[in-house]
Amino acid sequence: MKKLIGNDWDEVLAPAFESEKYQELRDFLKEEYQTKQIFPDMYHIFTAFKLTSFADTKVVILGQDPYHNPGQATGMSFSVNPGVPLPPSLKNIYKELYDDVGAVPVNHGYLKKWADQGVLLLNAVLTVPYGNANGHRGKGWELITDTAIKALSDRGKVVFILWGKFAQNKIPLIDEGKNVIIKSPHPSPFSADRGFFGSRPFSRCNDALIKFGESPIDWQLPQEVNPADMA
C-alpha cells in the first residue's frame, strides 16, 4: 500500500487506511476537493502525523477540526500559518501559557516547535469545507484519529490534553492507568473563563512527563518563524 505519511504511523494506522470506510472517505474527499474550497490543502492533511511520529509522541493536544477560513489551517490543531491573525482560542492559550510557565507570547500562531518535540497536534477530523465548521464530521476521519488515540493509549506514557467536551468525549479510548489526562473547558472566549484560565495544563503536562521519565516540553515558541522551517 502507498505510504500516506512516511513514518511509523503508516504501520500503526494501516488497518484503518485499508478499511472500506477509509476508501469511502477518499472518494468523498476527491469530490469535495474538486468542487469546493477545502482546508487544509491536500498536501497538509496529515501534517500532524508527519511532524510527530508514533514513537516520538509524548503529548496529544486534541482539537475538533481545522480552521475553516482561507490561510489558517496548517494540519496541526490550534496552529495557524505565520502572518494570519491569531484566532481567539489561540490568544487565550498564549495567555494561559504565559501565566502558567512564563512563555512570552509571540505574534504568530505557528506551533511546529511543539510538534518537533513530541506534541501531536491532532484534530479529530482532518478536513473542513470553507466556512463550515464540522462540515466533514462523521465522514470517516474519526476512524483514523480514534485508531491513533487508542494506539498511543495502549503504548502508554502519553499526556492527553483535552480541552472542552468534544475532546473529552475521547476519554473512553484512553487507558488512564498508563497515561495522564489533563482536561479543562475549551480556550474559546465562550468558555475560557469557566476553568481554562488557571488550569495550568503546560506545567502539569511537564510534571507528568518527568514522572514518566521523559524530557519536558519547552513551550516557548520562537519570536519569528523561519520560512525554511515550515512544514
UniProtKB/Swiss-Prot annotation:
The active site is at D65 (proton acceptor). Pfam families: UDG. Its main location: cytoplasm. It catalyses: Hydrolyzes single-stranded DNA or mismatched double-stranded DNA and polynucleotides, releasing free uracil. One of its GO terms (cellular component) is cytoplasm. Its EC number is 3.2.2.27. Keywords: Cytoplasm, DNA damage, DNA repair, Hydrolase. PANTHER family: URACIL-DNA GLYCOSYLASE. This is Uracil-DNA glycosylase. It comes from Lactobacillus johnsonii (strain CNCM I-12250 / La1 / NCC 533). The gene is ung.
